[in-house]
C-alpha cells in the first residue's frame, strides 16, 4: 500500500512536531517527524527539526546520522556542523566534536563576512 501526503498534511506534521519540541516534548516531536520523513525522506525542514529533537532527547547516534545526511546535502549550512558537533559530544567522541565545531566556526565567520 502506497501512502502519500499532500503538501498541507506534510506541513501539518512538521508544525506539530516543531510545536511539540517547543513545548519540551522532544520524544513526541520525533514520532511526528519520523512519520513525515518516512513518507518524504527528502523533506529538509523536517530533517532539521528532527535533528534538533534528537539532540534534545539525547539520542546522539541518531542525531549524528541525521546531521551527516544534512551535511551531505548542504555542506555550507553552518548549523548542520554545530549539530554534528553536539551529537558527537553526546556520543563521547570529543576529538570529532571539536573538529566539527571548528568547521562550524569557520563557516560562520565566512558567512558573516559576505
UniProtKB/Swiss-Prot annotation:
InterPro entries reported in the protein's UniProt record: T3SS_YscY, TPR-like_helical_dom_sf
Keyword check for Zinc-finger: no
Compartments (UniProt record): Cytoplasm
Chief location bin: cytoplasm
S-S pairs: none
SUPFAM superfamilies assigned: TPR-like (SSF48452)
A GO cellular component entry from the record: cytoplasm
Keywords: Chaperone, Cytoplasm, Plasmid
Assembly, per entry: Binds to YscX.
Name this polypeptide is given: Chaperone protein YscY
Name of the encoding gene: yscY
Amino acid at each position: 500500500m502506497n501512502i502519500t501526503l499532500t503538501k498541507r498534511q506534510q506541513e501539518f506534521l512538521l508544525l506539530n512536531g516543531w510545536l511539540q519540541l517547543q513545548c519540551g516534548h522532544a520524544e513526541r516531536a520525533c514520532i511526528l517527524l519520523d512519520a513525515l520523513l518516512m513518507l518524504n525522506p527528502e523533506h529538509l525542514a523536517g530533517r532539521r527539526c528532527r535533528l534538533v529533537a534528537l539532540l534534545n532527547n539525547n539520542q546522539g547516534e541518531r542525531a549524528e546520522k541525521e546531521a551527516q545526511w544534512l551535511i551531505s546535502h548542504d555542506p555550507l549550512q553552518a548549523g548542520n556542523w554545530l549539530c554534528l558537533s553536539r551529537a558527537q559530544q553526546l556520543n563521547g567522541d570529543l576529538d570529532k566534536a571539536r573538529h566539527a565545531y571548528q568547521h562550524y566556526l569557520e563557516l560562520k565567520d565566512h558567512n558573516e563576512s559576505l
